[in-house]
Structures are given as structure tokens and as C-alpha cells.
Amino acid sequence: MLSRVARNSSLLKQLPKLRQTTVLPVVLKNSIRFHATSSENKEIFTKLTDSKDPQRNQFFQYTWGSWLKNDKLNKKKRETVFSIEGLTLFLDTIKGFETTLSQPKHLHGSFVLGQNKDLLGEAEDKIILRSIASIHEGKHHRIYKLTLNTGRDLVLRIPYKLDSDAAIAAKIKSEVATLDFLNLKLGLKVPRVLSYGSDVYNEVGSPYILEEFIPGDLLMRKWHPLSPDSEETNKALHEVIDPIAEFQDKLLSVTFNKFGSLYFHDDVEGSLQNDLPYDGETNEDLKNRWRIGPSVERQFSKNKEKLPQNLIDELNGPWDASNPIALMESVADIELENAKNKLALINADAGANENDKDLINKQIKTFEHLKKITPLLINTKSKSIMNVEELFKPRLYIPDLDPLNVIQQGKDVNYFIDFEGSTIKPFILTGYPKFVAYEGAKIYNLEEDIPGYNELDELEKEQYAFMYYKTRNERMWEFELNKHRHDLIAVASPHIKVIKSPYLQALDLKTDNDHLYVEGSIVQLQALWEAYVANELVNSKDSKFPIEYTAEYLDQHQQDLSDHQLETVSSPFSATGGWIPQDMFNTLKDQGIIVETEDGNYKIETEKVLENPPKPEEKN
């Protein structure tokens, strides 16, 4: 059975009327994006007084890639239109704010963190926006760099319209509060936030975060995960792993009083404002600064835009620290409700595809199984799990700890960015950072673990070497965890990984068929259940597995899984959901390999690929 890693690695309200003022034109620069292959920057010129300038629209359009299916819709969701005029006027207004530490202050639909006003710099008269450059089109946001007449730079983050308005608002509020907490409470190097807006009803005209610009190089430049073993490789890998492990160690230093996500005091409903997020705060300025509210973990918003918000609000917490099982159950509940809602929508469509109905019914069955087994998965009082009580305490979890989200300044200064989806949950219910996580078969020594390794052909050696390097990198992460937090190292147990796998797989749904991996992880537990009950690892005293599978069901599941994996490894761009980097898309289209179909989608002409195989590189 292919793991996810192997599967993926094988493929690539009304607005206040704007005040009128005289401002200078702004040069809008479309800069090269991270991971892009464009050869030249393109500059777009527009006047602030002409908001209808057609040139300006190009600056907001998504250009990083194209999709084989629903390309126009996907790009429309990723347009990041905002008011340049409104932003300019708003920046000058912030200049008059007090710099005292207080709750974010409301201003024309936005919220301002006055203590960070120094990010604007000093101006004799007005704060003027000199230029805007698009520097990155990411998976969830577009990033703009703002240059002011004070010589200061800021970052404007505009989220794509991929989730409901309520979800986008909650994520922005929580991320800003999390950044504030990391900076003021833990003293960590993260961007300071100047202002944020949680909806379109502000002078920027869009949800946004306006924060400190951090210059430097991405730590990812130093990450070479498949380098052969050597003293130099070991040192290089540690230069990336160590600062991220140290950052996580500081995150784990605070134990919270609830499970959920961080918000500012005034951003949660009244019933939650009386509960302290953690105990022992001695700084009067921080005592009532943050609170714990509903979780913004991605599973409560991703692909949930058609689920009624009142239902989501019932399931996304916060939860009492004494009841981690309720947090786990909420994931099974929301996926089950989402699948049932999708089926209801399909049944209401007279022309619905029967294959779609069949797929949704299979999803429902899987999530019913998940709902049944979730409260039994882990014994929260198990004497067989070292420091089990510590493992279940509420701690802050950042889902995107990654060298791609670390900016280095000099040798030892590392700034961490991107805290969307941060949540407070038990450490035992988290996974390793994706850049070191490995779910495949472990190989600790190539020659000892692989009989006849030296006699294998080069291709087979490369495949086993890949597995070895992935194992090595994960082990290095575990060694660092053990060094910093030996009391939490039980998460490295293979048995703990198996037991919590159904829950984690449900948090990692990317395609409509990924429910198969959830079911597969439940099936895997069946053979081990009796031993886990005997050792009090699971929350059950019944050695009989709680889910009854028929041979027919298991055979069908295995066939569906094999078909899904075959499609994934054999279909170009299946792993990316049909998304293709724009330069590659243009080249393949020019070559006739990508062709447009009658319904406006695109397809790959396999025969064309065979007719035009890649040419060998010419030697100088």
C-alpha cells in the first residue's frame, strides 16, 4: 500500500465614504513569485485617481498556474481585489494612533494594533504609499510588498476566497492574536501586525492582514533532504531542523486551559471572555489580552462552504481541557455531516451523476466508522503511555512549521511566518512538520535492512535510498524532540502513530477519494486491537474490534484504494488537483500536449507526449 508521501512524491456592511485627498501615483510591480519560473518582472502603472484603469485588474488576477478543470472558477476564487486608494488613506490615518498596548482599536471597519505603529516610520507630513509589488501567490494568500515614503516596507496579505466569509474572518482574527501572543508572551521572532480587517467592510475593501516586512532568505534554501550521508550533510540538515525544533519547544512551554484557538479578548463572544486562556500571568498588560475561542483548524473550513454555519459553530469548539475526546469526535462529526450535506445536494439535482452518489455514500460509510471508533482510539489515562497526562494537555500547535516559512537574517536570526490555522490541542494529536514527516516503510540501514542491496540496479537503489533518507530526516526530528522535551517523546512510538492515524488521516483530506486512507487506517487497527486493549492503549476493555467488516467490503475498499493510487501515480498532475505551474502549462499547450475541451476544461493528449519525448540535453 502506497503511503501519502510516496503517492505525492511520485508526482510533481457599507463602506464609509473615502476621504478625498491628493496622492501620488503608485507603481504596481508584479515581481517574480517564489517557485515561479517567469524570466522577467512585469511592471504595471496606474493612477490612484483612476480606480477603473483596466491595467490595474491584471495586478489582482491569479497568474501562478492553471487548472485542467474549472480553471476560470479556480482563478476567480484567487483574485485579490482591494482598494489601493482606500489603503493609502488608511495608512495615513493610522499615523495618529497612540502607541500604548491595548486591545486592537476599531477604525473604519479595520482594527489597529497601536503598539506597532512604529512600523510606519516617521514622516514630516503625510504617510504616502510609493509602490506596491506582488511578491508571492501562495496556496491561501497573495502577498504584496508596500513601500512607504518613510523608507519602511510592509506586507499586505489578502486571502483567497476559498472558504466562507465566516471562516476567513475567524482565521484572520485568530492568526493575528496568535502572532501577538508569540511576540509579546513568548518573545519569538514573528512579524508584528499593524492592522487587520476580517471582512470587506473596511477601507481596504477586502479581508487582510497588514504586517511587518521581514527581509532575508528562506531557510528552505538550505534544505537538501535527499543528500547522501556525510558529516557535512548531517550539519546542513541540523541547520534547518534545529531552529524549527527550538521554535516548537518554546510553543510547548505554555499549557492552556481549553482546546480551541487564540483570539483577542474582544474578538470572542461574551460567554468566553471570562475564562483565562492560561494560568499564572503576572504581566498586567497581558492578563486580559487573549482568550480561547472556536478552533480554526483547517478541517472546520476546508471544503465546508456549503455546510450551514450554525452547524459548524456547534462542532468547532472550544472544548474543556478535561475532554480531548470531544475535540477528536468533532472531526468525525463535521466530515460526516459534510458528506451527508453533499449527498442531499446531489439528490436534489435530477441530473446528478450516479458515480458521484456512490462516492459520497462510501465517504459517509467511512466517516460513520470514524465516528464510532474515535472515542475508543486512545486511552487518555493509559499507564502504558509515558507521561500520558502531559501529552493530552492543551498546547499551541502551528500546522505550517516549515523551512519555507522561516526567513533567515544572518546566521542565527530566524523569523517565522504563516500561522494560519493555528490551534490549541493535545500534543499527542498532532503530526510532525510535513518537511520531515514520513509515513512510508522505515529503512534505518540500507545494507542491513535491504537484503542484496548492493546487487540491485540503480533505479531500485534510488527508491530504497529515498525511503532511507526520509526515515533519517524524521529520526533527526525525533532526536531533537527528545532532547528538548523528553517528557513528550512517546509520540514517536509506532503504536501511538498507528492508534491516532485515523484521526490524523481525517485531518489530511485533499481529494474526494482520500477517505480511503481514513478507512485503511481503521482497518489496520483491527489486527492490533486485541493487543492494544490488553495493554490499555486504547479506550476500550472489549477485545472485539468495534467495527464489523465483511470480506466483500474489505475487498472493495482495497480495489478502490488500488484504483485511486494507480490514478494518482499515472495521471499527470493528479497529485496537485490538476494544477500546473503557468510556464509549464503554456509550454505544454503550445506543444499540443494540453488541449482545451468543448466544456472549457483541458486534457492531456497522451499520444502527443509520446510523439514529443524530452530531448537529451546537448553537451557544450
From Swiss-Prot:
**Principal location:** mitochondrion
A single GO cellular-component term from the record reads: mitochondrion
Q: Transit peptide range?
A: 1-35
The record's keywords, sorted A to Z, are:
Mitochondrion, Transit peptide
> Where found?
Mitochondrion
Name the family the entry cites. Answer: Belongs to the AIM9 family.
Name of the protein this chain belongs to: Altered inheritance of mitochondria protein 9, mitochondrial
